[in-house]
Protein backbone atom coordinates (compact mmCIF):
# COMPACT_ATOMS: atom_id res chain seq x y z
CA UNK A 1 0.00 0.00 0.00
CA UNK A 2 1.48 3.39 -0.99
CA UNK A 3 2.34 5.90 1.71
CA UNK A 4 1.27 9.54 1.26
CA UNK A 5 2.20 12.50 3.45
CA UNK A 6 0.15 15.67 3.04
CA UNK A 7 1.12 19.09 4.33
CA UNK A 8 -2.25 20.83 4.54
CA UNK A 9 -2.08 24.56 5.12
CA UNK A 10 -4.23 25.96 7.89
CA UNK A 11 -5.45 28.67 5.53
CA UNK A 12 -6.56 25.94 3.12
CA UNK A 13 -8.49 24.00 5.74
CA UNK A 14 -9.85 27.06 7.56
CA UNK A 15 -9.62 30.18 5.38
CA UNK A 16 -11.97 31.70 7.95
CA UNK A 17 -13.82 30.23 10.92
CA UNK A 18 -17.07 31.19 9.16
CA UNK A 19 -15.89 29.69 5.85
CA UNK A 20 -14.33 26.32 6.71
CA UNK A 21 -13.08 24.07 3.94
CA UNK A 22 -13.10 20.96 6.11
CA UNK A 23 -16.28 19.28 4.88
CA UNK A 24 -15.07 18.80 1.27
CA UNK A 25 -11.90 17.20 2.60
CA UNK A 26 -13.64 14.59 4.75
CA UNK A 27 -14.88 12.34 1.95
CA UNK A 28 -11.75 12.87 -0.18
CA UNK A 29 -9.30 11.96 2.59
CA UNK A 30 -11.44 8.99 3.63
CA UNK A 31 -11.45 7.60 0.09
CA UNK A 32 -7.72 8.18 -0.32
CA UNK A 33 -7.01 6.36 2.96
CA UNK A 34 -8.89 3.29 1.72
CA UNK A 35 -6.12 2.70 -0.83
CA UNK A 36 -3.14 4.37 0.83
CA UNK A 37 -1.40 4.79 4.17
CA UNK A 38 -2.21 8.45 4.80
CA UNK A 39 -0.60 11.05 7.06
CA UNK A 40 -1.84 14.65 7.25
CA UNK A 41 0.15 17.48 8.85
CA UNK A 42 -2.02 20.55 9.45
CA UNK A 43 -0.72 24.11 9.57
CA UNK A 44 -1.84 27.07 11.64
CA UNK A 45 -2.76 29.45 8.83
CA UNK A 46 -3.91 32.99 9.40
CA UNK A 47 -5.12 32.27 12.93
CA UNK A 48 -1.63 31.25 14.03
CA UNK A 49 -0.15 34.35 12.42
CA UNK A 50 -2.65 36.55 14.27
CA UNK A 51 -1.78 35.00 17.63
CA UNK A 52 1.94 35.27 16.94
CA UNK A 53 1.59 38.91 15.90
CA UNK A 54 -0.34 39.69 19.08
CA UNK A 55 2.26 37.91 21.23
CA UNK A 56 5.04 39.91 19.60
CA UNK A 57 3.16 43.14 20.32
CA UNK A 58 3.48 42.20 23.99
CA UNK A 59 7.22 41.67 23.40
CA UNK A 60 6.93 37.91 23.91
CA UNK A 61 10.05 36.04 22.83
CA UNK A 62 10.13 34.02 19.62
CA UNK A 63 10.10 30.66 21.41
CA UNK A 64 6.87 31.63 23.18
CA UNK A 65 5.39 32.78 19.87
CA UNK A 66 6.39 29.46 18.30
CA UNK A 67 4.60 27.58 21.08
CA UNK A 68 1.44 29.60 20.41
CA UNK A 69 1.65 28.72 16.73
CA UNK A 70 2.06 25.02 17.55
CA UNK A 71 -1.05 25.15 19.74
CA UNK A 72 -3.07 26.58 16.86
CA UNK A 73 -1.84 23.90 14.44
CA UNK A 74 -2.90 21.23 16.91
CA UNK A 75 -6.28 22.89 17.37
CA UNK A 76 -6.81 22.81 13.60
CA UNK A 77 -5.59 19.21 13.52
CA UNK A 78 -7.98 18.24 16.33
CA UNK A 79 -10.87 19.76 14.40
CA UNK A 80 -9.92 17.67 11.36
CA UNK A 81 -9.70 14.50 13.48
CA UNK A 82 -13.18 15.17 14.83
CA UNK A 83 -14.52 15.79 11.34
CA UNK A 84 -13.00 12.57 9.98
CA UNK A 85 -14.55 10.50 12.76
CA UNK A 86 -13.82 6.78 12.57
CA UNK A 87 -11.55 7.24 9.56
CA UNK A 88 -8.91 8.98 11.68
CA UNK A 89 -6.68 7.91 14.53
CA UNK A 90 -8.55 9.48 17.48
CA UNK A 91 -5.72 11.64 18.82
CA UNK A 92 -3.50 14.29 17.24
CA UNK A 93 -0.05 12.74 17.40
CA UNK A 94 2.78 14.88 18.73
CA UNK A 95 5.90 13.12 17.44
CA UNK A 96 7.06 11.30 14.34
CA UNK A 97 7.51 8.09 16.32
CA UNK A 98 3.94 8.33 17.61
CA UNK A 99 2.78 8.87 14.03
CA UNK A 100 4.47 5.65 12.94
CA UNK A 101 2.82 3.72 15.78
CA UNK A 102 -0.59 5.26 15.07
CA UNK A 103 -0.34 4.22 11.42
CA UNK A 104 -0.43 0.58 12.51
CA UNK A 105 -4.16 1.06 13.16
CA UNK A 106 -4.77 1.67 9.47
CA UNK A 107 -6.41 5.01 10.26
CA UNK A 108 -5.58 8.46 8.88
CA UNK A 109 -2.87 9.92 11.11
CA UNK A 110 -3.15 13.66 11.77
CA UNK A 111 -0.60 15.92 13.41
CA UNK A 112 0.24 19.59 13.77
CA UNK A 113 3.45 21.33 14.74
CA UNK A 114 5.83 19.67 17.16
CA UNK A 115 9.01 21.74 17.50
CA UNK A 116 9.49 25.49 18.08
CA UNK A 117 11.23 27.11 15.14
CA UNK A 118 10.05 24.43 12.71
CA UNK A 119 7.15 24.92 10.29
CA UNK A 120 4.55 22.24 9.65
CA UNK A 121 6.01 21.88 6.14
CA UNK A 122 9.28 20.85 7.79
CA UNK A 123 7.41 18.51 10.13
CA UNK A 124 5.76 16.90 7.11
CA UNK A 125 9.06 16.61 5.24
CA UNK A 126 10.67 14.78 8.16
CA UNK A 127 7.58 12.59 8.45
CA UNK A 128 7.87 11.72 4.76
CA UNK A 129 11.42 10.56 5.39
CA UNK A 130 10.53 8.60 8.55
CA UNK A 131 7.63 6.82 6.85
CA UNK A 132 9.44 6.19 3.57
CA UNK A 133 6.61 7.97 1.77
CA UNK A 134 6.01 7.38 -1.92
CA UNK A 135 4.97 11.02 -2.33
CA UNK A 136 4.97 14.17 -0.21
CA UNK A 137 2.27 16.63 -1.29
CA UNK A 138 2.22 20.25 -0.17
CA UNK A 139 -1.30 21.65 -0.49
CA UNK A 140 -1.13 25.44 -0.70
CA UNK A 141 -3.04 28.48 -1.93
CA UNK A 142 -1.05 28.61 -5.19
CA UNK A 143 -0.80 26.03 -7.96
CA UNK A 144 2.91 25.28 -7.75
CA UNK A 145 6.35 26.83 -7.42
CA UNK A 146 6.85 30.08 -9.31
CA UNK A 147 9.92 32.04 -10.32
CA UNK A 148 8.50 34.94 -8.27
CA UNK A 149 5.39 35.65 -6.21
CA UNK A 150 2.60 35.35 -8.84
CA UNK A 151 0.33 37.56 -6.74
CA UNK A 152 2.78 40.42 -7.13
CA UNK A 153 4.61 39.68 -10.37
CA UNK A 154 2.44 38.99 -13.45
CA UNK A 155 5.54 37.77 -15.29
CA UNK A 156 6.16 34.99 -12.77
CA UNK A 157 6.35 31.54 -14.36
CA UNK A 158 5.34 28.25 -12.83
CA UNK A 159 7.83 25.40 -12.88
CA UNK A 160 6.31 22.09 -13.94
CA UNK A 161 9.29 20.05 -12.77
CA UNK A 162 12.52 20.78 -10.93
CA UNK A 163 15.06 19.08 -8.70
CA UNK A 164 15.51 19.82 -4.97
CA UNK A 165 18.62 21.95 -5.53
CA UNK A 166 16.71 24.15 -7.98
CA UNK A 167 13.84 24.50 -5.52
CA UNK A 168 16.28 25.49 -2.79
CA UNK A 169 17.72 28.21 -5.04
CA UNK A 170 14.22 29.59 -5.72
CA UNK A 171 13.23 29.58 -2.04
CA UNK A 172 16.48 31.22 -0.91
CA UNK A 173 16.13 33.87 -3.60
CA UNK A 174 12.56 34.68 -2.64
CA UNK A 175 13.24 34.76 1.10
CA UNK A 176 15.93 37.36 0.50
CA UNK A 177 13.17 39.80 -0.47
CA UNK A 178 11.48 41.38 2.54
CA UNK A 179 7.79 40.64 2.93
CA UNK A 180 7.65 37.79 0.41
CA UNK A 181 5.96 34.56 1.52
CA UNK A 182 7.45 31.47 -0.09
CA UNK A 183 5.51 28.28 -0.74
CA UNK A 184 7.93 26.23 1.39
CA UNK A 185 10.56 27.10 3.96
CA UNK A 186 14.25 26.31 3.61
CA UNK A 187 14.31 23.59 6.29
CA UNK A 188 11.54 21.64 4.55
CA UNK A 189 13.27 21.94 1.18
CA UNK A 190 16.57 20.74 2.63
CA UNK A 191 14.79 17.72 4.09
CA UNK A 192 13.33 16.94 0.66
CA UNK A 193 16.79 17.27 -0.85
CA UNK A 194 18.24 14.93 1.78
CA UNK A 195 15.66 12.15 1.62
CA UNK A 196 14.96 12.25 -2.12
CA UNK A 197 11.23 11.61 -1.72
CA UNK A 198 9.19 13.14 -4.58
CA UNK A 199 7.43 16.38 -3.65
CA UNK A 200 4.36 17.75 -5.39
CA UNK A 201 3.33 21.34 -4.69
CA UNK A 202 -0.24 21.99 -5.80
CA UNK A 203 -3.35 24.06 -5.11
CA UNK A 204 -5.19 22.59 -2.14
CA UNK A 205 -8.26 24.80 -2.16
CA UNK A 206 -10.25 22.20 -4.10
CA UNK A 207 -9.66 18.74 -2.57
CA UNK A 208 -11.13 17.10 -5.68
CA UNK A 209 -7.92 18.06 -7.50
CA UNK A 210 -5.91 16.07 -4.96
CA UNK A 211 -8.05 12.99 -5.45
CA UNK A 212 -7.93 13.33 -9.23
CA UNK A 213 -4.14 13.63 -9.16
CA UNK A 214 -3.75 10.45 -7.14
CA UNK A 215 -6.22 8.58 -9.34
CA UNK A 216 -4.97 9.69 -12.76
CA UNK A 217 -1.40 10.85 -12.18
CA UNK A 218 -2.22 14.10 -13.98
CA UNK A 219 -1.74 17.30 -12.04
CA UNK A 220 -1.37 21.06 -12.19
CA UNK A 221 1.52 22.02 -9.96
CA UNK A 222 5.24 21.55 -9.55
CA UNK A 223 6.84 18.13 -9.21
CA UNK A 224 10.20 18.09 -7.42
CA UNK A 225 12.31 14.96 -7.89
CA UNK A 226 15.97 14.04 -7.99
CA UNK A 227 15.78 12.10 -11.24
CA UNK A 228 12.93 13.85 -13.06
CA UNK A 229 10.78 10.71 -13.00
CA UNK A 230 7.05 10.98 -12.41
CA UNK A 231 6.15 8.87 -9.34
CA UNK A 232 2.58 8.41 -10.54
CA UNK A 233 0.82 6.07 -10.57
CA UNK A 234 1.88 5.15 -7.05
CA UNK A 235 2.88 1.53 -6.62
CA UNK A 236 0.23 -0.57 -4.92
Curated annotation (Swiss-Prot):
The protein's enzyme class: transferase
Source organism superkingdom: Archaea
Localization annotation: Cytoplasm
Family annotation (InterPro entries): AceGlu_kinase-like_sf, Asp/Glu/Uridylate_kinase, Uridylate_kinase, Uridylate_kinase_arch/spir
Substrates-to-products reaction catalysed: UMP + ATP = UDP + ADP
CDD domains (UniProt xref): AAK_UMPK-PyrH-Pf
Listed transmembrane segments: none
Record comment: activity regulation: Inhibited by UTP.
Annotated positions binding ATP: 10-11, 45, 49, 140, 146, 149
Gene Ontology biological process terms in this record: 'de novo' CTP biosynthetic process; UDP biosynthetic process
Residues binding UMP: 44, 66, 114-120
Functional summary from the UniProt entry: Catalyzes the reversible phosphorylation of UMP to UDP.
NCBIfam families per UniProt: pyrH_arch (TIGR02076)
Family: Belongs to the UMP kinase family.
The protein, known as: Uridylate kinase
Amino acid sequence: MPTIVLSLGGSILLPDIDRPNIKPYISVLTRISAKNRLFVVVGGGGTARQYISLARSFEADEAFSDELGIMVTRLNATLLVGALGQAAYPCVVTSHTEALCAAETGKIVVMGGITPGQTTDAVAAVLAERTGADIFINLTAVDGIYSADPRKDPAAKRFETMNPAELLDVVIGQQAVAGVNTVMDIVAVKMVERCGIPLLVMDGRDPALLESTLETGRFVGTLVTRNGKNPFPLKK
